Amino acid sequence: MTDQTTTRRVLLKLSGESFGGGQMGVDPDVVSALAREIAEAAKTVEVAIVVGGGNFFRGAQLSQRGMDRGRADYMGMLGTVMNALALQDFLEQAGAATRVQSAISMTQVAEPYIPRRAVRHLEKGRIVIFGAGAGLPYFSTDTVAAQRALEIQAVEVLVAKNGVDGVYTGDPRTDPSATLLDTVTYQDALQRGLKVVDSTAFSLCMDNDMKMVVFGMEPGGNVTRAIRGERIGTIVSN
């Protein structure tokens, strides 16, 4: 890793769906390809990652079917740890030194989440994967990504999406007139009710002047490009 004062540090948010290739569970081919992209970019950039768990459980959806929301959210958090461990394995196969930190104590599989330790890992050239969300119910992993980015002093949050390549004026899956935005302010995104990223994450970044880039995972190479800082997707800022 190069001089700490000049090295770019980013927080990459990966949805659980990106691990399953649209299916439940983990698709080894998909995660292996993703890990190779991240490992390549991490040679010159300090990379921390927050992973979702939607390929296993979605707490909000389970709670709509009558399950206690807190319990459902904890199940989702455990799903994110499974994804974190899978990604760690494939990153190490790709030659990248990696650490997993969990917001819920599980010392046999992951370190506890300690911000200063995470920063030290990054400075040593290791990729740090944050699992178990915030360790608290009612917090989305989008919000956790914004919070972790602020705490480790990343320069921006990179939100990788499946099925869309940035922020649109509406939902492109249901609104044929929706157009891709090159840039948008947090205020505008919140006022329009744009749902591509959780509104709490938008608010947290807005209040702390943290830049966000929302981009599509396809085609291959996009994750590497985003981590390196190439112009891609939609820039969300103040």
From Swiss-Prot:
EC number, UniProt record: 2.7.4.22
GO term, biological process aspect, one: 'de novo' CTP biosynthetic process
Binding site for ATP: K13, L14, S15, G16, G54, R58, N162, Y168, D171
Residues involved in UMP binding: G53, D73, A134, G135, L136, P137, Y138, F139, S140, T141
Keywords: ATP-binding, Cytoplasm, Kinase, Nucleotide-binding, Pyrimidine biosynthesis, Transferase
Metabolic or biological pathway, per its Swiss-Prot or TrEMBL entry: Pyrimidine metabolism; CTP biosynthesis via de novo pathway; UDP from UMP (UMPK route): step 1/1
GO molecular function list: ATP binding; UMP kinase activity
CDD domains: AAK_UMPK-PyrH-Ec
Main location per the UniProt record: cytoplasm
Pfam families named in the record: AA_kinase
GO cellular component, as recorded: cytoplasm
UniProt entry tagged with the keyword Kinase: yes
Notes on how activity is controlled: Inhibited by UTP.
InterPro entries: AceGlu_kinase-like_sf (IPR036393), Asp/Glu/Uridylate_kinase (IPR001048), Uridylate_kinase (IPR011817), Uridylate_kinase_bac (IPR015963)
Subcellular location: Cytoplasm
Assembly with partners or alone: Homohexamer.
Annotated family: Belongs to the UMP kinase family.
Protein task: Catalyzes the reversible phosphorylation of UMP to UDP.
PANTHER family, A to Z: URIDYLATE KINASE, URIDYLATE KINASE PUMPKIN, CHLOROPLASTIC
Protein name (database record): Uridylate kinase
Organism placement in taxonomy: Bacteria, Bacillati, Actinomycetota, Actinomycetes, Micrococcales
